[in-house]
Amino acid sequence: MKISLIFLFVIFSASLTFGQKPIPGQTSFAKPFILGVIDEIQSNELNEKRILNIYLPEGYNPKDTIRYPVIYLLDGSADEDFIHIVGLVQFNSFEWVNQVPKSIVVGIATVERRRDFTFPTNVTEDKSANPTSGHSNRFISFIEKELQPYIQEKYMTSSSKTIIGQSLGGLLATEILFKKPELFNKYIIVSPSLWWDNGSLLNQPLARFEHKDIYIGVGKEGLAPTKIPRVMEVDANVLADKIKNLKNRNVNVYFDYLPLENHATIMHQAVFNSFRLFYP
């Protein structure tokens, strides 16, 4: 069962709305600020309903012939990264900025990150600390077999598909790049948790692919939470070099070290930077 509801973001107070103040004696003019829609999809792959927060660009008309790129955002709940990433997309697509094409943003609301974003680990400590982890294969199947077909059928989409993932979401985006690169044209991988399973993903073969833009951003993050010491900045750099060394045709790889950012602050700046690199 798939349903759509209005996604409402209420302005903090009437006094903040466009800088205006209510006129004495008149009722408040405050009203909801519509940011997008909340959609719901029943997933057979995950055996559960999943919430999708959808941003549709200004001028979007389902009866029109214009089709839009789609940006798929992991950790896409309203209280996660959806609102500030949508702000970046909207701002950069304003006519007077014209940095990014008008795009649809699909925020995949999080249910259980460790379950959905990680593959099985052989590290005993990780298994004990995260007993439900290791089912990224099901989540990738959900994206491939259910989510993307649903979005393509319901919305006016082009063939351009971007994925954005940070931390464990960056690990998942990297796994998709390794195993199912055809699912996306552009990969925005931020502070990926490549330490998972003692960095085993970095040792796996990387499928050959063409026509990709890949951004890998990392801040000053230091040691990963592993028994065997791993540095997140080093792992991210190793990933970038591994992709570059394939010398695939028409593949652009951008490694971006942001020393003023940490694991908590990097997401917004990294996505902003990726847009500048993808759309010079």
Q: What residue spans do the PLM features occupy?
A:
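Active-site nucleophile loop of the alpha/beta-hydrolase fold
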Residues: 110, 188-196, 219-222
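A domain-start/cap signature at the N-terminus of enzymes
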Residues: 19-68
